[in-house]
Amino acid sequence: MSVQTAVPIEFSDAAARKVKALVEEEENPNLKLRVYVTGGGCSGFQYGFTFDEKVNDGDTTIDKDQVTLVVDPMSLQYLLGGEVDYTEGLEGSRFLVNNPNATTTCGCGASFTV
């Protein structure tokens, strides 16, 4: 009998596909998508995304479709139960966080309050 461990943050299929495409484009299989939270933005905190080759002590990793999402411990507390997604629309394309912990968000969705 196998036991499944719940992941602290979801990594959507769309986000994993886009990360995979970007990693292949860069021809660097060591790249991982790192999501983080910093102070700032119009609502108090803001999300950030970067590609990183390193996983630091204490980081949480979520693997999906041969790519990895990385979250540092400080950011994870604000992202628990959320989802990293990717969207393409009239406003352009971007990674975003669907965060159930956010009590308010700004119009662009890049900053939030808890």
UniProtKB/Swiss-Prot annotation:
SUPFAM superfamilies the record matches: HesB-like domain (SSF89360)
Pfam families named in the record: Fe-S_biosyn
Sorted UniProt keywords: Iron, Iron-sulfur, Metal-binding
Record: residues binding iron-sulfur cluster: 42, 106, 108
Keyword Nucleus in annotation: no
Domain of life of the source: Bacteria
InterPro entries xref list: FeS_biogenesis (IPR000361), FeS_cluster_insertion (IPR016092), FeS_cluster_insertion_CS (IPR017870), FeS_cluster_insertion_RrpA (IPR023063), HesB-like_dom_sf (IPR035903)
Any one biological process term the GO annotation gives: iron-sulfur cluster assembly
Cofactor: how and how many bound: Binds 1 iron-sulfur cluster per subunit.
Assigned GO CC terms: cytosol
Gene Ontology molecular function terms on file: 2 iron, 2 sulfur cluster binding; 4 iron, 4 sulfur cluster binding; iron ion binding
Cofactor(s) demanded: iron-sulfur cluster
Assembly mode: Homodimer.
Function: Required for insertion of 4Fe-4S clusters for at least IspG.
Similarity comment: Belongs to the HesB/IscA family.
Listed name of the protein: Iron-sulfur cluster insertion protein ErpA
Organism: Pseudoalteromonas atlantica (strain T6c / ATCC BAA-1087)
Source lineage: Bacteria, Pseudomonadati, Pseudomonadota, Gammaproteobacteria, Alteromonadales
